[in-house]
């Protein structure tokens, strides 16, 4: 297979399909989503059979249990796919909305219309559910998409792509609006991220090594985040019960997500009160604690252990594991300075009853999501009321934070006049 020619052909067809998608009605897009949902329900066994072959090959390669779990299409996973499709269909269609409409002294009205981005390339690892999630969001937002999933999920993705194509055709929409790259050749990714004539934006969903490669090689703009080094700062004017709840949930609700707390900052004025009960809570949940000297002194006196001395590397680390770095800081200024220096601009929270300090934290912490008296785990499209998300961005241009339907659109200016000319 000539990868260069193959990818160029996918891009050309996607660009052509994107024009039809931009003018597609809400009814047609929702009909396509419903048709795909019904096709998954109808062909559930065939999907599981294709997936079983992918899983068998993954086991032969000796891939670990966590990888196999992400790859597997269980009955529950298929049910979640169907529910997700119908949920996206129920969301308001942002395309064509005109907002910020203002009268100008010249007599014209100026506003902004929400429009699709065009062609979106999605690069992700071997999680077949992302094929449906990404296709649904791109379809509803009026975009065409080229999906490049992990090589271990080739048969699963091909089977899903067939059903997506059927759904698009049934709704009178172009099948090329959703195309799945049908090769495991890594050169396909290299081509996709440089096809500026055909692809408007890349959304990578994967590990750090994938994102770093794309940062170095991509010519197409990206919506991405590299790390989720999230902080909770407990102020000396915090409510202790709230602090315990937030710190527990932010770390132990799920360890392997990008919005999990990785560093806990504690004001020196509350450290002796907060750290003993919190340290015992983490110890009981088998969370390894990597602590600075001040935190060690308080925790050791309270009989909490074992403790590991933190190094500078710990403040830079996204563990994605039951490991937590803890530092005692002088106060709000030191906490903000630490977060802006070591953080990844993803999600950070303060626990405090002081309104002025909370507002300062919101203004001065340079992150995509900033929270007061709430767990960092809330940094999620569903929790934010977006309905669904295609990922989270910690960049500052275009989309920032959880990226839902609106994040896959752009704004263009529209002018409504009555024959006016500029004087």
From Swiss-Prot:
CDD domains: ALDH_F18-19_ProA-GPR. It is found in: Cytoplasm. GO terms for biological process: L-proline biosynthetic process. Signal peptide: none annotated. It comes from the Bacteria. One of its GO terms (molecular function) is NADP binding. PROSITE patterns: PROA. Its EC number is 1.2.1.41. One of its GO terms (cellular component) is cytoplasm. It catalyses: L-glutamate 5-semialdehyde + phosphate + NADP(+) = L-glutamyl 5-phosphate + NADPH + H(+). InterPro entries: Ald_DH/histidinol_DH, Ald_DH_C, Ald_DH_N, Aldehyde_DH_dom, G-glutamylP_reductase_CS, Glu-5-SA_DH, GPR_dom. SUPFAM superfamilies: ALDH-like. Catalyzes the NADPH-dependent reduction of L-glutamate 5-phosphate into L-glutamate 5-semialdehyde and phosphate. The product spontaneously undergoes cyclization to form 1-pyrroline-5-carboxylate. HAMAP family: ProA. Belongs to the gamma-glutamyl phosphate reductase family. This is Gamma-glutamyl phosphate reductase. It comes from Burkholderia ambifaria (strain MC40-6). The lineage of its organism: Bacteria, Pseudomonadati, Pseudomonadota, Betaproteobacteria, Burkholderiales.
């Amino acid at each position: 297979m000539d990868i260069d020619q193959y990818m160029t052909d996918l891009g050309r067809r996607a660009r052509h399909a994107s024009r039809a998608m931009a003018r597609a009605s809400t009814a047609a897009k929702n009909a396509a989503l419903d048709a795909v949902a019904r096709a998954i329900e109808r062909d559930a066994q065939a999907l599981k059979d294709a997936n079983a072959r992918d899983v068998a090959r993954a086991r032969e390669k000796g891939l670990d249990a966590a990888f196999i779990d992400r790859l597997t299409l269980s009955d529950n996973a298929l049910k979640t796919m169907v529910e997700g499709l119908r949920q996206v269909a129920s969301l308001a269609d942002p395309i064509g909305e005109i907002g910020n409409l203002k009268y100008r002294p010249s007599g014209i009205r100026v506003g902004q219309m929400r429009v699709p981005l065009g062609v979106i390339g999605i690069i992700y690892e071997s999680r077949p559910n992302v094929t449906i999630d990404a296709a649904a969001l791109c379809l509803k937002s009026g975009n065409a998409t080229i999906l490049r999933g992990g090589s271990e999920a080739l048969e699963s993705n091909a089977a899903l792509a067939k059903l997506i194509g059927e759904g698009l055709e049934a709704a009178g929409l172009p099948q090329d609006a959703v195309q799945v790259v049908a090769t495991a050749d890594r050169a396909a990714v290299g081509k996709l991220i440089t096809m500026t004539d055909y692809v408007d934006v890349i959304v990578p969903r994967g590990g750090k090594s994938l994102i770093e490669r794309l940062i170095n090689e991509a010519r197409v703009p990206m919506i991405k985040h590299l790390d989720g080094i999230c902080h909770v700062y407990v102020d000396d004017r915090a409510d202790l019960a709230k602090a315990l709840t937030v710190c527990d949930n932010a770390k132990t609700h799920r360890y392997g997500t990008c919005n999990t707390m990785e560093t806990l900052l504690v004001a020196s004025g509350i450290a002796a009160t907060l750290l003993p009960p919190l340290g015992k809570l983490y110890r009981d949940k088998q969370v390894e604690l990597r602590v600075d000297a001040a935190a060690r002194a308080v925790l050791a006196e309270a009989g909490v252990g074992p403790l590991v001395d933190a190094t500078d590397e710990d403040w830079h680390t996204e563990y994605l594991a039951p490991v937590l770095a803890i530092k005692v800081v002088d106060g709000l200024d030191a906490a903000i300075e630490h977060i802006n220096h070591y953080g990844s601009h993803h999600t950070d929270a303060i626990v405090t009853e002081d309104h002025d300090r909370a507002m300062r934290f919101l203004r001065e912490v340079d992150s995509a999501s900033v929270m007061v008296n709430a767990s960092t785990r809330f940094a999620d499209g569903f929790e934010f009321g977006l309905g669904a998300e295609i990922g989270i961005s910690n960049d500052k241009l275009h989309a920032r934070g959880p990226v839902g339907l609106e994040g896959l659109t752009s704004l263009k200016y529209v002018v409504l006049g009555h024959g006016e000319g500029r004087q």
